[in-house]
């Protein structure tokens, strides 16, 4: 059995970890970062870009860059109006009234977009470990519905991963904190404020058991909402000052989003920050275009006023979790803050104030704790971690619709999973031969105020007076928090059931088709990455050639210059149309040949005139230290021979 990785699939950033020597470690990605932006883009030529590179091009490609897809996964169209109004990409109704997105005329489900992020994380883990990865534990917000959990599993399947377990994010954070405190009896409250959700869980830790006592949260409150108050403040002020509505310009809104996110981050450590956005819009003054800019100072106190309602809203789930667990603030031993937005000083102060001045524990990294916990759970499932038992709960009650539109709970919230419950119901009218079972999730008394999960029918009931037939309903929840419901007529033995899948749930054939599609893209993605690296080398080479030519035109004859320029143009053209590995290798050879030509010209230039000051080719570090046959770390001096001055540059070789 290969390594099982732990993945924190976040709204803003994602993170992957793995167990090494019994301890969880973060996997660095190809870019050398410990987290990866959960962003997917499609370029002009249809090339798919994921992560940091997708984030870098978002301003110039706003309509085809998808972010915060976690806000839409497993949710219905009518429930997402506020979220849809904020994004710069196009949302369209999908199967079963879900939310799909359009990128470059292609319609994608949230599962597919999430799978693209998961696929990159998987590839990064394979590069890091040097072996294939096929299994994972993925975390989700504790307040994710059954449909959202199943949709996340579907995304994992599309990415080619067998999802061994879905773990609640605050529970994973507690695992990462408590792995070295297994025999310490304590109650931990985990406050997890991520990009789109807030979760609060209370756990009892002792005798190697992590038992969740209660969980509460808000699926519509996260870091994105704190960014949004700054975006609105900037857009409103600009509208008042310039009579230009930046909300109508997707590129401008994307720039506002990025600047607002950075301002929020800055204000976590600084008392004030400057938001500078030149050329954000253009106005017509006296018939001529005039560029407009934003340069404004935002103080931490201003931001806290703008976000005061959001800060206050974070306290409600804490109160609910304490109430559900029958605990007081004095009975909580540790408070863990998790999620990037938990760094906001106003949040930390509000939590500390609520707990009577008790200081939250800041020893764990808010961005990495959840992935580390997922890796520990992966180790438990893989047998590497022993004597650790995790007992999680369902966040919302599960039940069904009964006569009069009443929601009847079968399994109460905060019930430990896995679990099952059975209850007997009967018919509502005489001669009734069919019952429809409507399964819901929520806490309200009426059906209309709760989340519908699915419906199915049990037919073939023998006609009888109402109240006579006995219909046995069984609710079964697995360790992932995913529900199976079955109904059986005790009189005939006839049975029917349903596995609650994601809203707009994908069939196994659809998942398989998307998985094959993702594998096809994987090869294209690798070619695109290599092409970008090659293009960077080429641009450096061309820049060096042009600067050398500009400063030393007398060193090249027309006969020498023309073939070089032809080679440069051919390479530039070739880099625009690479489609396979063979073409890529051919371009590498052409680039290497061109590099040698330019090296030769540069060497000739130095031989002719010791005063030439332009290095002909953009040097790498290896170029500067030179080749060293004896393997020692020598210092190589590059000198300029000049009667007037001698410049010596020392470069020390470092292994």
Curated annotation (Swiss-Prot):
The keyword S-adenosyl-L-methionine is assigned to this record: no
Biological role: Acts as a chaperone.
Protein name per Swiss-Prot or TrEMBL: Chaperone protein dnaK1
Residues modified to Phosphothreonine: 197
Native organism taxonomy: Bacteria, Bacillati, Cyanobacteriota, Cyanophyceae, Synechococcales
Molecular functions (GO terms): ATP binding; ATP-dependent protein folding chaperone; unfolded protein binding
PROSITE patterns: HSP70_1, HSP70_2, HSP70_3
InterPro entries per record: ATPase_NBD (IPR043129), Chaperone_DnaK (IPR012725), Heat_shock_70_CS (IPR018181), HSP70_peptide-bd_sf (IPR029047), Hsp_70_fam (IPR013126), SHS2_FtsA (IPR003494)
UniProt cross-references to SUPFAM superfamilies, sorted A to Z: Actin-like ATPase domain (SSF53067), Heat shock protein 70kD (HSP70), peptide-binding domain (SSF100920)
HAMAP family xrefs: DnaK
Protein source organism: Synechococcus elongatus (strain ATCC 33912 / PCC 7942 / FACHB-805) (Anacystis nidulans R2)
Pfam family name, one: HSP70
Keywords: ATP-binding, Chaperone, Nucleotide-binding, Phosphoprotein, Stress response
UniProt similarity note: Belongs to the heat shock protein 70 family.
UniProt entry tagged with the keyword GTP-binding: no
Alphabetical list of CDD domains matching this protein: ASKHA_NBD_HSP70_DnaK-like
Listed GO biological process terms: cell division
């Amino acid at each position: 059995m290969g390594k099982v990785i732990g993945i924190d699939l976040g709204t803003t950033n994602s993170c992957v970890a793995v167990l090494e020597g019994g301890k969880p470690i973060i996997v660095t990605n190809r870019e050398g970062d410990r987290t990866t932006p959960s962003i997917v883009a499609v370029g002009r030529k249809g090339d798919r870009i994921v992560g940091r590179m997708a984030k870098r091009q978002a301003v110039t490609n706003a309509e085809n860059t998808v972010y915060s897809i976690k806000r839409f996964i497993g949710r219905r169209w009518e429930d997402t109006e506020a979220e849809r109004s904020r994004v710069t990409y196009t949302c369209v109704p999908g199967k079963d009234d879900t939310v799909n997105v359009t990128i470059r005329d292609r319609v994608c489900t949230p599962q597919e977009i999430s799978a693209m992020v998961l696929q990159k994380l998987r590839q990064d883990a394979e590069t890091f470990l040097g072996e294939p990865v096929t299994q994972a534990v993925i975390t989700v917000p504790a307040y994710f519905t059954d449909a959202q959990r199943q949709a996340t599993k579907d995304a994992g399947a599309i990415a080619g991963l067998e999802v061994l377990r879905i773990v609640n994010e605050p529970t994973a954070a507690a695992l990462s904190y408590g792995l070295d405190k297994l025999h310490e009896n304590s109650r931990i409250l985990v406050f997890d404020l991520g990009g789109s959700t807030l979760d609060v869980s209370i756990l009892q830790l002792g005798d190697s058991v992590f038992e969740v006592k209660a969980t509460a949260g808000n699926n519509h409150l996260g870091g994105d909402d704190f960014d949004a108050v700054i975006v609105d403040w900037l857009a409103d002020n600009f509208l008042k000052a310039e009579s230009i509505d930046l909300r109508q310009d997707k590129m401008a809104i994307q720039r506002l989003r990025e600047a607002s996110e950075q301002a929020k981050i800055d204000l976590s450590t600084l008392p004030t920050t400057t938001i500078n956005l030149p050329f954000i819009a253009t106005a017509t003054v006296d018939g001529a275009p005039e560029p407009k800019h934003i340069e404004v100072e935002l103080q931490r106190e201003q931001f806290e006023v703008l976000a005061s309602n959001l800060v206050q809203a974070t306290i409600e789930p804490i109160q609910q979790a304490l109430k559900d667990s029958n605990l007081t603030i004095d009975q909580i031993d540790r408070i863990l803050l998790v999620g990037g937005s938990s760094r906001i000083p106003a949040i930390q102060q509000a939590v500390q104030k609520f707990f009577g001045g008790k200081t939250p524990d800041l020893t764990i990294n808010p961005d990495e704790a959840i992935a580390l916990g997922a890796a520990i759970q992966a180790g438990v499932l893989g047998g590497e971690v022993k004597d650790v038992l995790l007992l999680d709960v369902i966040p919302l009650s599960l039940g069904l619709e009964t006569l009069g539109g009443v929601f009847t709970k079968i399994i109460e919230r905060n019930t430990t999973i896995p679990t099952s419950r059975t209850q007997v119901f009967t018919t509502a009218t005489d001669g009734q031969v069919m019952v429809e079972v409507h399964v819901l999730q929520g806490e309200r008394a009426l059906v209309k105020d709760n989340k519908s999960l699915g419906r199915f029918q049990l037919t073939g009931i023998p006609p009888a007076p109402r109240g006579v037939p006995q219909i046995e309903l069984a609710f079964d929840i697995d360790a992932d928090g995913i529900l199976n419901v079955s109904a059986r007529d005790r009189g005939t033995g006839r049975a029917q059931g349903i596995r609650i899948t994601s809203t707009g749930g994908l069939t196994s054939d659809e998942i398989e088709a998307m998985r094959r599609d993702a594998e096809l893209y994987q090869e294209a993605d690798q070619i695109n990455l290599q092409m970008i690296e090659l293009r960077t080398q080429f641009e450096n080479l061309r820049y060096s050639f042009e600067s050398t030519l500009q400063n030393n035109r007398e060193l090249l004859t027309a006969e020498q210059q023309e073939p070089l320029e032809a080679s440069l143009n051919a390479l530039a053209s070739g880099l625009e149309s690479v489609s396979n590995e063979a073409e890529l290798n051919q371009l590498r050879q052409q680039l290497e040949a061109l590099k040698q030509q330019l090296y030769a010209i540069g060497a000739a230039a130095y031989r002719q005139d010791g005063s030439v000051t332009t290095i002909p080719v953009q040097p790498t570090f290896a170029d500067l230290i030179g080749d060293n046959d004896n393997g020692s770390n020598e210092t190589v001096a590059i000198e300029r021979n000049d009667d007037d001055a001698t410049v010596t540059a020392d470069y020390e070789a470092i292994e």
